[in-house]
Amino acid sequence: MIRIVRAELHGITVTGADLDYHGSITLDPEHCDLAGIRPLEFVDIWNKQSGARISTYVIFGEAGSKCCILNGAAARTCQRGDQVIICSSSYVEETALYDTAPMVLTFTPKNDVKDVLRYRVKETARRPFDFFIETLPRAENSDVDDGSAADRAIA
């Protein structure tokens, strides 16, 4: 068995840190649902600013809030405004790599979903386990402003 990425929130911005709350990370359930992260699931959190690496479990905050709040002892590792990578994992047999397709979400500084990606492993002529990233269409209800709306309004 090998440990693999199962789902990832990449570059989400910390919106709060609550030292006095019991441990966990509070996340917007809409982000978690899209990525496939479940409540009470253990996740690894990597702080892009400080390099801190911690592990805790997920609880859901308010839907649509775009929250990312470190609670309890985890609150000591991040500050509001820090960007973090939140990664869930699972153990699979090596041959099951071909059947996995982890969902990876990237974020804007305001925690809107920027990109929806899938990681894939396929056998190629180069190697038995080759890595690919697929870009998926963004959800219709995404609040991401890529500037195209402003361009249309001016034209």
Curated annotation (Swiss-Prot):
Major enzyme class: lyase
BP GO annotations: alanine biosynthetic process; pantothenate biosynthetic process
Details of cofactor binding: Binds 1 pyruvoyl group covalently per subunit.
Alphabetized Gene3D superfamilies for the sequence: 2.40.40.20
InterPro entries found in the cross-reference section: Asp_de-COase-like_dom_sf, Asp_decarbox
Positions bearing Pyruvic acid (Ser): S24
Keywords for the protein's UniProt record, in alphabetical order: Autocatalytic cleavage, Cytoplasm, Decarboxylase, Lyase, Pantothenate biosynthesis, Pyruvate, Schiff base, Zymogen
Cofactor(s) the record lists: pyruvate
Entry's localization field: Cytoplasm
Pathway(s) annotated for this protein in UniProt: Cofactor biosynthesis; (R)-pantothenate biosynthesis; beta-alanine from L-aspartate: step 1/1
A GO CC term assigned to this protein in UniProt: cytosol
Superkingdom, natural source: Bacteria
HAMAP family registered for this protein in UniProt: PanD
Family: Belongs to the PanD family.
Annotated protein name in UniProt: Aspartate 1-decarboxylase
Organism: Agrobacterium fabrum (strain C58 / ATCC 33970) (Agrobacterium tumefaciens (strain C58))
Lineage, highest ranks first: Bacteria, Pseudomonadati, Pseudomonadota, Alphaproteobacteria, Hyphomicrobiales
